[in-house]
Amino acid sequence: MFYRVGKFKHELGKTDEIMGFFKSNEDTFKASEGLKGVFYFKASEEEVVGVAMWESKEHFEQSADRIQSVLSGLAELISGPPEIYEGNSGYNFNKD
């Protein structure tokens, strides 16, 4: 698995609007081959963190333009470019 994590800083009170933005783009996520899942959480009053799980880095790269077009629509809601971290899974624990 390949993971991509984005940390988005925003003005106080924008969290719900940002979450709504991502929810409104679910069709784009569904159309992204190899995307296993994505979730976002409120990390602080002024930060949202998103985690995307892909089958492989190649799958992410094939959909990068589509995903970037979604993120460009987020520009007016965030305070600057997101911090991005990415890499392949090194350790996994599943209780299932």
Please identify what each model-predicted range represents.
Residues 2-3, 7-9, 35-49, 72-96:
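Glycine-rich beta-strand-turn "strand-cap" elements at beta-sheet edges
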Residues 9-19:
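Short, surface-exposed ligand-recognition loops at beta-strand->loop->(often short) alpha-helix junctions
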Residues 24-36, 53-85:
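An amphipathic, aromatic/His-enriched active-site/gating alpha helix that lines ligand/cofactor pockets
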Residues 11-13, 43, 55-57:
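Short coil/turn motifs at secondary-structure junctions
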Residues 15-17, 47, 59-61, 93:
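Intrinsically disordered, low-complexity acidic/polar segments
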